[in-house]
């Protein structure tokens, strides 16, 4: 990392250690070929540590969710026996039979919407209502023309998306500089733009942390608490992050309950999404079911934060279709596994 000039940009855990999760490697693999190659090798090597998915006679894999496994109330699923805990490429094995299909439904810009409506920042709510809060932010601060369309300003949109989310979790100009790989003056300028634009959110965040410190705990709408201790110095970013993530987890749990009460079969809950197993019907009825899923999930958000959140859906008719990069990595791993299996079979025959 030092040789590649990435050490200062590389994110760290709350204990100060360099992060080694797949999400971090994925982010840096887009800007550094060596990191991309290392990520690929790491995935293949670590695949040997997978304990295997617990598949029953019915073809279902079952793994514990470990609800409330994190301080924010989010799940903490196993990276060894849960396909959604393992690297994304492992999702290729997810599929269904000819009589069913899967619906992968996820909330659009969930964290940004939660920030906006918990804080009641009118500028941030306007950004959400625009349909693309990150492009709106870039336009609002004058980084792109007010009539710009996403496909023509993708680079600028991504810059302000990363900045919007990072600053929402307490990122400083120095942290933003390292995260984005830009100069400190540029990072300071972008930081000041976003803080000024969404100053109501910034004040709300400070006030809710002050209130939590005063009474000794944070609390969500439905009563999940995070107790603060005078024996431990909490990471400031954790305190800023907690209200957003904890209410995101409450939205997910509310949706899980409501979908179950509507007799939808939930296969898995993910960070900001739900995987639902549906019986194949005529196209009109399937569309009706999907529309109901989206409505239930949107309503779940409104019950928690007072505003609905839009939902995107992906239909999986046979097996999970990966993005180009992850699909390629999976094919490489699968090829190596087949060769290894063939080698073991040949060795067994020689012994016999």
Where are these regions (language model features)?
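Membrane-interface starts of transmembrane alpha-helices
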Residues: 153-160, 187
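Short, amphipathic alpha-helical "recognition" segments used to contact nucleic acids or chromatin
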Residues: 158-169
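Short Gly/Ser/Thr- and Asp/Glu-enriched loop/turn motifs at secondary-structure junctions
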Residues: 1, 158, 191, 268-273, ...
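Extended, well-ordered alpha-helical scaffold/bundle regions in very large, multi-domain proteins
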Residues: 1-33, 169-207
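Polymerase palm active-site segment centered on the conserved acidic dipeptide of motif C
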Residues: 194-208, 281-352
């Amino acid at each position: 990392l030092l040789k590649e000039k990435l050490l200062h940009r590389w994110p760290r855990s709350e204990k100060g250690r360099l992060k080694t999760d797949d999400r971090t490697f994925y982010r840096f693999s887009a800007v550094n070929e060596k990191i991309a190659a290392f990520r690929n090798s790491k995935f293949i090597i670590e695949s040997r540590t997978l304990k295997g998915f617990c598949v029953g006679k019915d073809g279902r894999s079952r793994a514990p969710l470990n609800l409330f496994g994190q301080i924010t109330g989010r799940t903490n699923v196993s990276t060894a026996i849960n396909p959604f805990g393992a690297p994304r490429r492992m999702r290729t094995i997810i599929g269904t039979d000819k009589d069913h299909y899967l619906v992968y439904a996820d909330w659009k810009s969930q964290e940004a919407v939660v920030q906006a409506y918990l804080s009641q920042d009118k500028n941030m709510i306007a950004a959400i209502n625009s349909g693309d809060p990150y492009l709106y932010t870039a336009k609002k601060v004058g980084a792109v023309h007010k009539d710009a369309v996403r496909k023509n300003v993708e680079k600028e949109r991504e810059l302000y998306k990363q900045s919007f989310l990072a600053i929402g979790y307490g990122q400083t100009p120095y942290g933003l500089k390292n995260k984005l790989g830009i100069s400190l003056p540029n990072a300071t300028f972008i930081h000041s733009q976003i803080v000024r634009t969404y100053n109501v959110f910034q004040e709300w965040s400070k006030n809710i942390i002050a209130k939590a410190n005063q009474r000794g705990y944070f609390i969500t709408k439905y009563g999940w608490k995070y107790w603060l201790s005078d024996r431990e110095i909490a990471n400031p970013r954790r305190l800023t992050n907690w209200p957003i993530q904890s209410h995101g987890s409450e939205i997910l749990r509310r949706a899980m309950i409501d979908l179950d009460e509507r007799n939808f079969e939930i296969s898995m809950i993910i960070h900001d999404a739900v995987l639902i197993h549906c019986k194949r019907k005529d196209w009109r009825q399937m569309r009706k079911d999907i529309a109901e899923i989206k409505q239930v999930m949107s309503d779940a958000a409104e019950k928690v934060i007072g505003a609905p959140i839009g939902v995107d859906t992906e239909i999986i008719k046979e097996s999970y279709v990966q993005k180009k990069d992850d699909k390629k990595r999976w094919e490489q791993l699968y090829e190596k596994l087949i060769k290894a299996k063939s080698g073991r079979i040949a060795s067994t025959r020689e012994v016999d």
